[in-house]
Amino acid sequence: MKKITMIKMEGCPYCAAAFQAIDEIKKNYPPTELEVIDENFQPQLAEKFTDYYYVPSMYVDGKKIYEAHPGESYDECFASVKKVFEAAR
């Protein structure tokens, strides 16, 4: 599996939903490296990713696959996170 990078912020409800989806989805996929970057605490790492506005944003080998949007439902988040894992295969 390819490396997945997730950019998040502490206290973000959409990030919490993404982590819940990851916990459910990863059971059905081979182990993969998941790098989590907190935008507030690791700005030097987050600034390498210049093509996102909302968090969470998820990348596979540096290519953005998912970016949350305001008002996103858990089902939308789950489907998007699943696409990330599919892209990492």
Feature map (PLM): residue ranges:
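Proline-centered flexible-loop/turn and helix-kink motifs
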Residues: 27-30, 50
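Structural micro-motif
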Residues: 49-60
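Thiol-based oxidoreductase modules, predominantly thioredoxin-like and allied folds used
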Residues: 31-44
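Non-catalytic, surface beta->alpha helical segment in thiol-disulfide oxidoreductase systems
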Residues: 60-89
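Short aromatic-enriched loop/helix-cap "lid" or pocket-rim segments at secondary-structure transitions
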Residues: 47-49, 71
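Local sequence-structure signature of Cys/Sec-based thiol-disulfide redox active-site neighborhoods
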Residues: 1-28
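Hydrophobic beta-strand residues in large extracellular and virion-surface proteins
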Residues: 4-6, 34, 58-60, 81
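Short alpha-helical
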Residues: 13-14, 41, 72
